[in-house]
Design a protein with these regions (language model features):
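N-terminal anchoring/stem segment of glycosyltransferases
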Residues: 1-69, 73-84
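Short glycine-/acidic-enriched loop or helix-start segments at secondary-structure transitions
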Residues: 21, 48-49, 96-99, 148
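Short beta-strand-to-loop acidic/aromatic patch adjacent to the donor-nucleotide binding site
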Residues: 82-94
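Conserved donor-nucleotide/metal-binding helix-loop-beta segment in metal-dependent transferases, i.e.
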Residues: 93-125
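Short His-Asn-centered micro-motif
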Residues: 12, 39-41, 88-89, 112-113, ...
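Generic structural signal for small/hydrophobic residues in well-ordered secondary structure
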Residues: 36, 90-91, 140
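Catalytic core and acceptor-binding pocket of nucleotide-sugar-dependent glycosyltransferases
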Residues: 131-226
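Extracellular/periplasmic catalytic domains that process cell-envelope and extracellular macromolecules
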Residues: 2-4, 79-80, 103-104, 129-131, ...
Length: 226
């Protein structure tokens, strides 16, 4: 069994409980994590959970996708005591434990690569960013604690500085990996390159993940597992 004692496996949700619990159990089938947490409203968690899953109360209820994104940026670190967190969802979890490499732990953020797009994922300095999807991602406690040290703006749709952004979107992965990536990097955070991220997670077919069966997936299974 793969020992990931420095990683906490997490599902943050108060809906679709059966699917999220199943995703947690699927992810722990061949892996021993440092901790396994279902962060939710306790009155929404079914009884009789497997003993490996520890339930923690949300700091405040999540009622929308914006609430979720805000929680992931500013609050999730309060639940984590290991060096890293693997956040999963009911539509994305571990599918290939053998693809794990300790190289992943050298980074503060890894998520499935985004496709290169002419008009998307452009940071305030005009650079295209490709890593990466936050729904199923590996993050360091160091990265999660950055908002406790410096101001990480939530509203990234106002003014000239964020002129490259998609107005009206508050997605947490866009905030951390595109809009305010420079602020995290100033605190020493290191983002995985596309080639490493492609080995970590699959979301859609890309030249970089051709022929690979990554460690986790988000939404769509890699071709080798369909």
């Amino acid at each position: 069994m793969l020992d990931l004692k420095d990683v906490t496996l997490v599902a943050l949700t108060n809906m679709r409980m059966e699917g999220h619990i199943s995703a947690l159990m699927e992810s722990t089938e061949h892996i021993k994590f440092g901790d396994v947490k279902l962060i939710s409203e306790k009155d929404k968690v079914p009884s009789g959970l497997p003993s490996v899953i520890n339930v923690e109360e949300m700091i405040y209820p999540i009622r929308s996708i914006d609430d979720y994104s805000f929680y992931m940026i500013y609050n999730i670190g309060q639940h984590i005591e290991t060096t890293h967190m693997l956040i999963i969802q009911d539509h994305g979890f571990v599918v290939n434990p053998s693809a794990w490499t300790d190289e992943f732990l050298e980074y503060d953020y890894i998520g499935a690569p985004w496709a290169w797009s002419e008009n998307a994922y452009i940071d305030p300095f005009g650079n295209h960013q490709r890593v990466g999807n936050g729904g199923v991602s590996l993050r360091s406690k160091k990265l999660m604690d950055v908002p406790n040290k410096v101001v990480i703006p939530w509203d990234v749709n106002q003014g000239d500085f964020y002129k490259h952004m998609n107005a009206g979107l508050f997605n947490e992965d866009g905030n951390i990996c595109v809009h305010n990536k420079h602020l995290y990097e100033e605190q020493g955070c290191k983002y995985a390159p596309v080639e490493v991220a492609a080995k970590f997670s699959y979301e859609r077919d890309l030249p970089e993940n051709k022929g690979l069966t990554p460690f986790v997936f988000h939404y769509s299974l890699p071709p080798s597992l369909r």
